[in-house]
Structure formats: C-alpha cells, structure tokens
Design a protein with these regions (language model features):
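Short, surface-exposed ligand-recognition loops at beta-strand->loop->(often short) alpha-helix junctions
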Residues: 10-20
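Extended hydrophobic/Leu-rich segments
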Residues: 26, 48-49
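An amphipathic, aromatic/His-enriched active-site/gating alpha helix that lines ligand/cofactor pockets
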Residues: 18-40, 55-93
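Residues that cap or initiate secondary-structure elements
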Residues: 13-15, 58-60, 98
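Long, low-complexity, Ser/Thr/Gly/Pro-rich intrinsically disordered segments that act as flexible linkers
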Residues: 43-48, 84-105
Length: 105
C-alpha cells in the first residue's frame, strides 16, 4: 500500500523559473532520501502553478510519520536554507487511489 499526497502550488509572480530550478535541484534527491517517491510534477507557466505528487509506503499515518521526520531532517534544512519566498499559496491534500476500467498507470 502507498499513500499519495497531491501538492498544488501557486507561485509568486516572477518566480516560476527560479522555483523550478530549485525544485529540480533539491526535491528529487531530498524527498527520495527521506523515503518518498515523486510520482509526477507539472508546471503551468501561464497561471504560475506547479502541481506534483509524492508518495510513501504505508497508510496515511505512516505517511505523516515519514513527513514529520523529513520536515526536521538536515537535508531538508539545507534545501530550504536561504530560499526566498517563491510559493504564494499551498494546496496539499491526500489523494484517493481510484482505479478506472481501461486506464493503466
């Protein structure tokens, strides 16, 4: 069983490219080291949006425990050290695993 968290960000105007460069440099490495899998990541330049999903083994409670350990990790602290405010709004929710007939993935 995996738990998936959908993360939708509205970025600060003018920070789209800088945020993507930062995210690409840090998040795959730091999240993976903490036990997460990045399922996908998409940017929508026209609306300054960035949408991605991260998952971890286990149920909702296991995900939260993994997330709590990640939040206080030195790797995360290094990734965010000196980072300017680039996200104006966060929308973070757990996603249901919905199986649709005829759709693979």
């Amino acid at each position: 069983m995996r738990t998936i968290q959908l993360r939708r960000y509205t970025l600060v105007d003018g920070e789209y490219d800088a945020f993507l460069a930062w995210w690409d440099e840090w998040m795959p490495r730091v999240r993976s080291a903490a036990g997460f899998v990045i399922e996908f990541a998409y940017g929508i330049r026209e609306t300054n949006e960035f949408v991605w999903a991260v998952s971890a083994e286990g149920d909702h409670e296991a995900f939260i425990a993994t997330e709590q350990a990640y939040m206080v990790s030195p790797e995360r602290a290094e990734a965010f050290d000196g980072m300017p405010k680039q996200v104006a709004e966060y929308n973070i929710r757990f996603a249901d695993d919905v199986r649709i007939a005829g759709v693979t993935g």
